[in-house]
C-alpha cells in the first residue's frame, strides 16, 4: 500500500504543528508554556486547578502557614501596639449645647410645618433624637417594652418607686372629672356657635349600623385601596382633587395624615375642581383657607374652556425643576369618586386619554399618562375613607354612589332639602313658593310629588312616582344643576348672623387693609431680595403661580346674598407679571415641551372668554368687540383660501394687524413664534346643522364694497 503525499513530512513542513485545546496553535517543541502546563494538563485545565486551589494558605505538616493566601494579612502586621495618650483620641468630636439643640429643633419644626418649603438635601443627623414626638401628642413610648412589669413590680423590681402619674384614688377621680368637664365645655361651645351637624358629629361620634347595604360601601374595597397605594408609592407629587362645593367633605383625611407621617418626602397639592359651580368669593376663601396646609389651585376641567390649566402645569414644572436629579417625576391624582380626576388629566392633555362619565366609579384601575418628557400623570380610582361620622345619606350626597342603583332614593331627599335653599328648588323645578321652605319627610313628599307630576313620572292610576323623581333630583344635585355650596370658615360679618355695628365693621376693614398693605410690602421686599440673590449666584428664578380668581365664569346663577363678593387682596395684573417674567426667563429651556400638545404655561390669557362661547348672552359692548375680532379672523382665513393676490385695502388691514401683533410679541415673543394652535370654539363661527343661521356678525365696511352677500375671489369667478 503506497504512502500519500501527506505522509511525507519533508514534503509537508507544517505537518508537525497541532492546535492545542486552549485555542493556540503551537509547535511540538515550542518553549512558550503556561505555568502549570505539563504533559497531563494543558493551559486551560491548569488555570482551572489554580482557581480551585487558590485563596488558601499553604501550611506545613504542623499546621503553620508557610505561604499566606492572597489578600491575607500576615501575623507580623498585627503586633501589639500602644495608643498615644492624647485627649483628642478620647474626647468628643462634636459637641453642641442644649440651647443650640432646642433652637435647631424649633427651626426644624417650623420648616417641616411649612407646606411651601421643600427639603432638597437631607443631612446625616440623628433625626429621631431631634424630633420630640412625645411632647406634641405623638406616639406614646412603649413603656411595657422599655420597663417590663416584672422589672418594675414584685421581688425582682430594679427600682424602689414606680413612676406613676396618679398616686391615689382621689387624684384618679379628679383627673376623670376634669376630662369630662372639658368635653362638656367643648360640646356646649359647638352648640352655641351653631356650626351645623358636622361639628357636632365630630364630638359625639355617632355609630353606623354594622349591617349596611353593599352599595354604600363603594370605594372602600381592598382592591380600590390597593390601587391607591400603588399610585402613592409611584408618585413624587400627589394631587388631591377636591369638590369646590364641599372641599372638607371630599378630603380624604386619613390619606393626608398618612402622607404627612409616613411619606413626608412626597409633595401634596390640593386642586379645587368644579369652581364654575360656586361663586367666586367662595372659591377665593376656600383657596385661602386650604393654602395654609398645602398649595391649592382653583381649577375648572374642560378641554376647550378650562381655568387653572396654566397654573397647574407651571406648578408641576416647578416640582420638576426641584427634582432635577431625576429623569422624570410622576404626579398622582387621588380623591373621592366623581370629583374630576380623569377630567383634569384630559384637560392637561387637551384630548380624551381617560374615560370620564358624570357618574362615580368610571375609573377602575390606575393608568399612566405622559404629559411631558419629564412629567408623567397617574390616574387613580376614587376612594372613600371609612368614617363613623358619615351616614348613608352623606355618602349619597357626596356623589359616591350611583343613584340608579339605589333601592330607596327618596329617603335621602329630606337631608338634601336641609342643605339647599328653597328658592333654588323653586327656580330649578318650577315649584310654587312656600313660606319657610320644606322640611322633614312631609316636605320631601310634597316636593317629590310636585316634581313627579310636573315631569310626568307617574305610576298606574296616575300616582306620582316619588322614587323616580328622587333619582332625578339626586342626579341634578350631583351634576351641579341644583345650586349648593358649603360656606368657607369665615367670620360672619354680613347677613342675618351679623350683629356688629357699622363703626366696628369699619375699624375691622381698616385694620384688614393695613395688614394687607404690610403683607404686600413684605412680599415685594422678599421678591427683590430673591432676585438680587439669584443674580449674584446665577440661579434662575422660578416663576410664581398667580390665578385671577375673579375671572372665573360661574355657570350657576346664585341669589344676591350668595353671590356677594369680598375683596380678599388686590389683584395682580397678569400682563405686568408676564412682562417681568419674560425679561427674567428668556433663557428658559424648551426641551420639556417636545412631547406636549399644549404646554399651557400662559394658557390663562389664551383661553376662550365667555363672549366667544356664548355671544348672545354677553354684554353688548363686549360681544361686539369679540365678534369684530372673530370677523377679522374669518376674513383673513377666507382671503388665504380664496384669493391669491390680496388687494390694497387688505394689505393695509394686514399691516395694521401685523403692527398689533408686533406689540404683543414684545411681551411674549417666545410664545407667539411657536407653531402651536390657539384654542378656538368651532360652534361660534360655523353653521352646524343650520342652527346658527340667525347669528348676525357685524360686517367690516372696508372688506366688501359691493353687495352684502356677493362672493369675491376665485369662487365668484367660477360662479359667473
From Swiss-Prot:
Taking every annotated instance into account, which residue ranges of this chain make up the domain CP-type G? 225-386
Q: Which residues bind GTP?
A: 335-342, 379-383
* Record field: compositional bias (Basic and acidic residues): 132-145, 507-527
InterPro entries in the record: G_CP_dom, GNL2_CP_dom, GTP-bd, GTP-bd_ortho_bundle_sf, NOG2_N_dom, P-loop_NTPase, TRAFAC_YlqF/YawG_RiboMat
User: A biological process (GO) annotation for this entry?
Assistant: ribosome biogenesis
Q: State the family named in the UniProt similarity comment for this chain.
A: Belongs to the TRAFAC class YlqF/YawG GTPase family. NOG2 subfamily.
Which miscellaneous remark does the UniProt record hold?
Answer: The C.neoformans mating-type locus is unique, spans >100 kb, and contains more than 20 genes. MAT-encoded products include homologs of regulators of sexual development in other fungi, pheromone and pheromone receptors, divergent components of a MAP kinase cascade, and other proteins with no obvious function in mating.
**Record protein name field:** Nucleolar GTP-binding protein 2
Q: Which organism is it from?
A: Cryptococcus neoformans var. grubii serotype A (strain H99 / ATCC 208821 / CBS 10515 / FGSC 9487)
Q: What is the lineage of its organism?
A: Eukaryota, Fungi, Dikarya, Basidiomycota, Agaricomycotina
Amino acid at each position: 500500500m503506497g504512502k500519500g503525499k501527506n505522509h511525507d513530512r519533508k514534503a509537508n513542513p507544517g505537518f508537525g504543528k497541532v492546535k492545542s485545546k486552549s485555542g493556540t496553535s503551537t509547535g511540538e517543541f515550542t518553549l512558550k508554556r503556561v505555568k502549570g502546563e505539563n504533559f497531563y494538563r494543558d493551559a486551560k485545565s491548569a488555570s482551572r486547578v489554580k482557581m480551585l486551589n487558590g485563596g488558601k494558605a499553604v501550611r506545613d505538616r504542623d499546621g503553620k502557614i508557610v505561604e499566606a493566601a492572597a489578600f491575607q494579612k500576615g501575623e507580623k502586621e498585627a503586633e501589639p501596639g500602644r495608643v498615644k495618650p492624647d485627649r483628642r483620641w478620647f474626647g468628643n468630636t462634636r459637641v453642641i449645647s442644649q440651647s443650640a439643640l432646642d433652637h435647631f429643633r424649633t427651626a426644624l419644626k417650623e420648616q417641616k410645618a411649612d407646606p411651601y418649603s421643600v427639603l432638597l438635601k437631607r443631612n446625616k443627623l440623628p433625626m429621631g433624637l431631634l424630633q420630640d414626638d412625645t411632647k406634641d401628642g405623638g406616639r406614646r413610648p412603649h413603656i411595657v417594652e422599655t420597663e417590663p412589669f416584672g422589672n418594675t413590680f414584685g421581688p425582682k423590681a430594679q427600682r424602689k418607686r414606680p413612676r406613676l402619674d396618679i398616686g391615689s384614688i382621689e387624684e384618679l377621680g379628679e383627673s376623670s372629672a376634669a376630662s369630662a368637664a372639658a368635653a362638656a365645655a367643648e360640646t356646649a361651645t359647638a352648640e352655641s356657635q351653631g356650626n351645623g351637624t358636622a361639628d357636632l358629629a365630630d364630638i359625639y361620634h355617632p355609630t353606623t349600623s354594622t349591617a349596611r347595604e353593599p352599595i354604600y360601601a363603594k370605594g372602600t374595597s381592598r382592591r380600590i385601596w390597593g390601587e391607591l397605594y400603588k399610585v402613592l408609592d409611584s408618585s413624587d407629587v400627589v394631587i388631591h382633587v377636591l369638590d369646590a362645593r364641599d372641599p372638607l367633605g371630599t378630603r380624604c383625611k386619613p390619606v393626608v395624615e398618612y402622607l404627612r407621617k409616613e411619606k413626608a418626602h412626597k409633595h401634596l397639592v390640593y386642586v379645587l375642581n368644579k369652581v364654575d359651580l360656586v361663586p367666586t368669593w367662595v372659591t377665593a376663601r376656600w383657596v385661602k383657607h386650604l393654602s395654609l396646609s398645602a398649595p391649592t389651585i382653583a381649577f375648572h376641567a374642560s378641554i376647550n374652556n378650562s381655568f387653572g390649566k396654566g397654573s397647574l402645569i407651571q406648578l408641576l414644572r416647578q416640582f420638576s425643576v426641584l427634582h432635577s436629579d431625576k429623569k422624570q417625576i410622576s404626579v398622582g391624582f387621588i380623591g373621592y369618586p366623581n370629583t374630576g380626576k380623569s377630567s383634569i388629566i384630559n384637560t392637561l392633555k387637551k384630548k380624551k386619554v381617560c374615560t370620564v362619565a358624570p357618574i362615580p366609579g368610571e375609573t377602575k384601575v390606575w393608568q399612566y399618562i405622559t404629559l411631558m418628557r419629564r412629567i408623567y400623570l397617574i390616574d387613580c380610582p376614587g376612594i372613600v375613607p371609612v368614617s363613623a361620622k358619615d351616614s348613608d345619606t352623606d355618602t349619597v350626597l357626596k356623589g359616591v354612589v350611583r343613584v340608579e342603583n339605589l333601592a330607596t332614593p327618596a329617603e335621602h331627599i329630606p337631608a338634601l332639602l336641609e342643605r339647599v335653599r328653597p328658592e333654588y328648588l323653586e327656580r330649578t323645578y318650577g315649584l310654587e313658593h312656600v313660606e319657610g321652605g320644606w322640611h322633614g319627610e312631609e316636605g320631601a313628599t310634597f316636593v317629590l310629588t310636585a316634581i313627579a307630576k310636573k315631569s310626568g313620572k307617574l305610576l298606574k292610576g296616575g300616582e306620582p312616582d316619588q322614587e323616580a323623581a328622587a333619582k332625578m333630583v339626586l342626579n341634578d344635585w350631583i351634576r351641579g344643576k341644583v345650586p349648593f355650596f358649603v360656606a368657607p370658615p369665615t367670620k360672619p360679618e354680613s347677613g342675618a348672623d351679623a350683629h356688629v355695628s357699622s363703626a366696628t365693621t369699619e375699624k375691622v376693614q381698616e385694620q384688614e387693609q393695613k395688614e394687607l398693605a404690610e403683607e404686600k410690602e413684605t412680599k415685594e421686599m422678599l421678591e427683590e431680595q430673591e432676585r438680587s440673590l439669584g443674580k449674584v449666584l446665577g440661579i434662575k428664578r422660578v416663576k410664581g403661580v398667580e390665578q385671577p380668581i375673579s375671572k372665573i365664569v360661574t355657570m350657576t346663577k346664585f341669589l344676591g346674598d350668595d353671590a356677594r363678593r369680598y375683596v380678599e387682596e388686590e389683584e395682580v395684573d397678569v400682563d405686568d407679571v408676564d412682562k417681568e417674567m419674560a425679561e427674567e426667563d428668556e433663557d428658559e429651556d424648551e426641551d420639556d415641551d417636545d412631547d406636549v400638545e399644549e404646554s399651557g404655561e400662559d394658557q390663562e390669557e389664551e383661553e376662550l372668554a365667555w363672549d366667544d362661547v356664548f355671544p348672545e348672552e354677553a354684554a353688548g359692548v363686549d360681544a361686539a368687540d369679540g365678534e369684530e375680532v372673530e370677523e377679522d379672523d374669518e376674513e383673513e382665513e377666507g382671503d388665504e383660501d380664496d384669493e391669491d393676490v390680496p388687494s390694497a385695502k387688505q394689505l393695509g388691514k394686514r399691516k395694521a394687524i401685523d403692527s398689533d401683533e408686533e406689540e404683543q410679541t414684545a411681551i411674549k415673543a417666545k410664545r407667539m413664534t411657536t407653531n402651536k394652535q390657539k384654542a378656538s370654539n368651532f360652534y361660534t363661527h360655523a353653521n352646524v346643522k343650520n342652527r346658527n343661521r340667525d347669528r348676525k356678525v357685524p360686517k367690516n365696511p372696508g372688506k366688501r364694497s359691493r353687495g352684502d352677500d356677493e362672493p369675491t375671489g376665485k369662487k365668484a369667478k367660477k360662479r359667473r
